[in-house]
Curated annotation (Swiss-Prot):
Any Pfam family the entry gives: Ribosomal_S7
Signal sequence range: none
Gene name linked to the record: rpsG
Upper classification of the organism: Bacteria, Pseudomonadati, Pseudomonadota, Gammaproteobacteria, Chromatiales
GO cellular component entries: small ribosomal subunit
General function of this protein: One of the primary rRNA binding proteins, it binds directly to 16S rRNA where it nucleates assembly of the head domain of the 30S subunit. Is located at the subunit interface close to the decoding center, probably blocks exit of the E-site tRNA.
Oligomer and partners: Part of the 30S ribosomal subunit. Contacts proteins S9 and S11.
PROSITE patterns noted in UniProt: RIBOSOMAL_S7
Homology family: Belongs to the universal ribosomal protein uS7 family.
A single MF term (Gene Ontology): tRNA binding
Protein name, UniProt field: Small ribosomal subunit protein uS7
HAMAP family associated with the record: Ribosomal_uS7_B
């Protein structure tokens, strides 16, 4: 690894419709094979679906969903003298949101609704109410960290 200067983070442009960088990042994660317009259609469709269900602003639902899915701690494998320990470590803020988005998307892709926009809307609504597969994933991660608390002194 080079030990020179730290590579600057690239700024993501705010979303044209809602003016949110978070939404742009989410669209980038939904996007496959560089098809941004398709990803935007899915994302906006999901947000419109949330709005039509009579909820507060869809961006608030998205933010609460991400807040409820963000993990505080995770486990990382650490090899110590032939044995591999699952060491609990705190998650950096940027990684928290990235993991939350990834887990929301994975959970949405596994749902049974007909279109991806409906699946994503359903998963976001579930997550904003602290239920659903994405929230379960976070709870499982926290449970793993809690179970391996004894190895926390192996942190690096």
């Amino acid at each position: 690894m080079p030990r020179r200067r730290e590579v600057p983070k690239r700024k993501v442009l705010a979303d044209p419709k809602y003016g949110s960088e978070l939404l742009t990042k989410f669209v980038n994660m939904v996007m496959r094979d560089g098809k941004r317009s398709v990803a935007e259609k899915i994302m906006y469709g999901a947000l419109e679906r949330i709005e039509s269900k009579g909820h507060e602003t869809p961006m608030e639902v998205l933010e609460t969903a991400l807040e409820n899915v963000q993990p505080k701690v995770e486990v990382k494998s650490r090899r110590v003298g032939g044995a591999t320990y699952q060491v609990p470590v705190e998650v950096r803020p940027e990684r928290r949101t990235t993991l939350a988005m990834r887990w929301l998307l994975d959970a949405a892709r596994k749902r049974g609704e007909t279109t991806m926009a409906l699946r994503l809307a359903g998963e976001m609504l579930d997550a904003s109410e602290s239920r659903g597969a994405a929230v379960k994933k976070r709870e499982d991660t926290h449970r793993m960290a809690e179970a391996n608390k004894a190895f926390s002194h192996y942190r690096w």
